[in-house]
Amino acid sequence: MTCSVFIGTSLDGFIARPNGALDFLPMDGGEPHGYSEFFASVDALVIGRKTFETVLAFVEWPYGNKPVIVLSAGQLDFSKLRDAKVEQMAGPPAEIVAKLAARGFQHLYVDGGITIQEFLRAGQIQRLTITRVPILIGQGIALFGTLPHDVKLKHIETKQYVSGLVKTEYQVVG
C-alpha cells in the first residue's frame, strides 16, 4: 500500500488561513500542475472531518466516483451526497491503512492538515508532493506539526511553473 500527499501551501508553509479559507490557492484550473495525473493514480482518498466539511461547501463534489474515507469518531451526515462513494472510519493510521489494503486498495491519497500530520507521525506516508504558492500569508494552518523524530526525505523532482508555483516531490525514506 502506498499513501501519498498532494497539497498546496503558501511559501511560509500554511495550507489554509486560520479560519480554514483557501482563497490564496489558485483555483482557476489554468496551468496543469500534475494533479489530474496524480488523482488518476489513486484508488481512494482518506480525509479528515474538517477537510470533508470544507469540500462539502464546494459547488461540485471534487472527487467524482473515487471512494472517499472520512476519518471521524463522531457521526457524520452523508445525506447531501448523492452519487459519491463516501464512508466513515476511525482508528489509528496503521489500522486504517491495513483495513483498506485488505479491501484491495493499493494507492491512497491522504489529505487534510491533521490527517496528513497523523499519518506522517505514524510512518504511513510514502510520498509527498508539495506545491508552493508564491505568497506569504503570515499565519494559518501549518502543513506539518510536531514529529516524534526526524522524517528523512529523498528529493524526486522539482518543477517550476510560469505562474510562479513550485512543485516538489519527495519519497519518505525514514
Predicted ranges, named:
Residues M1-G174:
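Enzymes that bind and transform nitrogen-containing heteroaromatic metabolites
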